[in-house]
Design a protein with these regions (language model features):
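A conserved, positively charged/aromatic
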Residues: 76-85
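Acidic donor-binding loop of glycosyltransferase active sites
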Residues: 178-191
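Short acidic alpha-helix that forms the nucleotide-activated donor recognition element
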Residues: 169-180, 201
Length: 288
């Protein structure tokens, strides 16, 4: 039986919860500990700091995804001479941003997402029994939010607004999801996007005003790098548009198809503890 040492306390709370669930599923013993304990463990995971792995030829190392949004020279300190290390990014687009930089150093980069809590975020009402509509707003231009609210008004919709930057209570969000007919997403780049995935897990169809580039984040200094708000998505989840001019037509299609979407199925097939756990098992196996 393998065991894992998890170092550092910078792990995102949702990642931590998902990681523990996966390790339990795989029957891998684990401990949140210190670099001085490496000798006692088979697999070492550090989400946010480099470790010189050249000192530990017989261990397996997993790093990321919390080093930084963009490639960082911190990775140079990993020194993967034994080919026993891997860096993880939660989605394809975020991996692609790192790849050109990481090619210069001997460190494989793999797409690995953390699971959604499908037990907590699960529906208990059919869509026809739900009556709420919400907007999830995160780091986009406030003018765009006003355009959406104005559009809703014309459709006689009064949406609940969850503003990521202003913070909100997760229990309120969960309560809304359980009672939501649909949600509208106004978000910038997401490499994982837990709040969106949690809505899908509650079987809430989503209408997404998506981004194409990172500089669409409000007041950001990012370059025009390709990205998305919904890295985990297929046609069962809802509809996507990119420009306010497309909203009316996309909304019409979305409402017509509202009862046909199956977002929870998508989550169960791609982001459940079991599915992500299998990917973790493969990730570990593939480290030499």
């Amino acid at each position: 039986i393998m065991n894992m040492l998890i170092i550092g306390n910078e792990i995102h709370v949702k990642n931590k919860e998902g990681l523990e669930k996966m390790l339990n599923e795989l029957k891998i013993k684990y401990k949140f500990g210190h670099i001085s304990e490496i000798d006692k463990y088979d697999i070492i995971y550090h989400p946010s700091q480099a470790i010189d792995t050249s000192k530990y030829p017989n261990k397996k190392f997993i790093f990321g995804p919390h080093f930084s949004t963009f490639p960082t020279n911190k990775l140079l300190d990993i020194k993967n001479v034994h080919n026993n290390s891997v860096y993880i990014q939660p989605s394809i687009w975020s991996k692609e941003i790192w790849e050109p930089h990481i090619k210069k150093i001997n460190l494989p980069i793999k797409v690995f997402s953390f699971p959604v809590n499908t037990e907590k975020f699960k529906p208990d009402k059919k869509i026809e029994e739900r009556d709420r509509i919400f907007i999830y707003f995160k780091r986009r231009n406030p003018h765009e939010l006003l355009l959406l609210i104005d559009f809703c008004k014309k459709k006689n919709i009064i949406p609940f607004v969850f503003d990521y930057v202003k913070r909100y209570n997760e229990e309120d969000y969960l309560d809304c999801l359980k009672n939501a007919k649909f949600g509208i997403i106004l978000d910038a780049h997401e490499s994982q996007g837990f709040a969106i995935e949690e809505a899908l897990s509650c079987n809430v169809p989503l209408l997404v005003w998506n981004v194409k580039t990172m500089n669409q984040e409000y007041r950001s200094t990012y370059r025009e790098l390709s990205c998305t708000s919904v890295p985990y998505w297929d046609e069962r989840c809802g509809e996507i548009f990119y420009n306010i001019k497309e909203l009316e037509d996309t909304f019409k299609i979305f409402i017509e198809k509202l009862h046909t979407y199956e977002p929870r199925k998508y989550i169960e097939e791609n982001l459940s503890v079991e599915k992500c756990g299998k990917k973790l098992e493969t990730l570990i196996k593939d480290i030499k």
